[in-house]
Amino acid sequence: MGIKKLTDLIEDNAPTSIKTNILKNYFGRIIAIDASTSLYQFLIAMNADVSSALTNQLGETTSHLQGMFYRTIKLISRGIKPIYVFDGSAPVLKSGELAKRQARRKEAKENLKEATEVGTNEEVQKFAKRVITVTRKQNEDCIKLLTLMGVPIVKAPCEAEAQCAEIVKKGKAWATGSEDMDSLTLGSTVLLRRLFFSEAKKMPILEFELQSVLEGLGLTQDEFIDLSILLGCDYCDSIKGIGPKRAIELIQKHKSLEEVIKHLDKSKYPLPEFFPYPEVRELFKNPNVIPADQLPPFQWKDPDVEGLNKFLVEEMGFSDVRVAQGIEKLKKFKNTSVQSRMDSFITVIKKPEDPNDKKKKVTKTPSKPSAKTSKKSSSTFKRK
């Protein structure tokens, strides 16, 4: 689930709220990861060439396990502590969007079949990406894998990104790792995108800080939620003719969707037949999640060596040598990832002011200004 054109809107109106970073700089951070979007990325990355898709001896796809195993090891080797959150049932309001996706996937399957017979390799890859979906078994496989690796998982009652946001808002994790921008709409204080992008692509991680986004856009969180609905989300259709620029102008001026609709020229901007924005707003403000304080303490345990070998090597046909190497890396870096960042426990204590200091006169010799001027470096994301 995402918000249409929200990244572009933030980039244009609040560019300083987007920073670029690299994986190693998140050492010691606890990150709540939307497992579903991660799995989708793994499947796309490894199945783009359908002829080389990874499978076991039974012909079952194993790309999701390959991606999850090695990318998780990479996170842990950088000192990051991941928590994977899996989707539960989709909200009823999302059924319309799911039906649209199913129709698009059916059409893509037909196009893929035709492209495989007479099309170019580029066409095959394009349609192959569109037919990929994450199955229940693939989710269960990954839950089993992560448990054997000693990595904590959470099964959300509904949307994974909403559960991630709850965990972050309550201070149980530092950021949400997801490609879906609605993580910000749901209140995650920090969002990391491109967390699982291959470092070979040389694409930096994008870091969004919610408070900076709100300040840059000049909105409250409630107004930001209404803006997200107006831009378009998975829960309801958007108003045709209203793009990102017009949407933020309307919310900044009228402050709420009720007032926007009240002053809108309906002949020019007719409302969609199905536009339950009050219910959608409620889903963003009070999503169906497990309260963070009711979740068990997150623990990163030692890997189950015997269990990993049985599952990955015997059942899934992985290389025993590579699995052994992966397990050794898990053991090696587990203690590293348990260490905390210095800034997580250092508190600056201000020295009490001595009233006698005010009576002392200190004469300073003015220093000459330096001939050199320092240039400010910026890590904000700029669109090329």
Swiss-Prot record:
Mg(2+) 1 binds at D34, D87, E159, E161. Binds 2 magnesium ions per subunit. They probably participate in the reaction catalyzed by the enzyme. May bind an additional third magnesium ion after substrate binding. Its EC number is 3.1.-.-. Phosphorylated. Phosphorylation upon DNA damage induces relocalization to the nuclear plasma. Structure-specific nuclease with 5'-flap endonuclease and 5'-3' exonuclease activities involved in DNA replication and repair. During DNA replication, cleaves the 5'-overhanging flap structure that is generated by displacement synthesis when DNA polymerase encounters the 5'-end of a downstream Okazaki fragment. It enters the flap from the 5'-end and then tracks to cleave the flap base, leaving a nick for ligation. Also involved in the long patch base excision repair (LP-BER) pathway, by cleaving within the apurinic/apyrimidinic (AP) site-terminated flap. Residues 123-254 are annotated as: I-domain. Keywords: DNA damage, DNA repair, DNA replication, Endonuclease, Exonuclease, Hydrolase, Magnesium, Metal-binding, Mitochondrion, Nuclease, Nucleus, Phosphoprotein. This is Flap endonuclease 1. Residues 338-346 are annotated as: Interaction with PCNA. It comes from the Eukaryota. It is an enzyme of class 3 (hydrolase). One of its GO terms (biological process) is DNA replication, removal of RNA primer. Belongs to the XPG/RAD2 endonuclease family. FEN1 subfamily. The keyword Plastid does not apply.
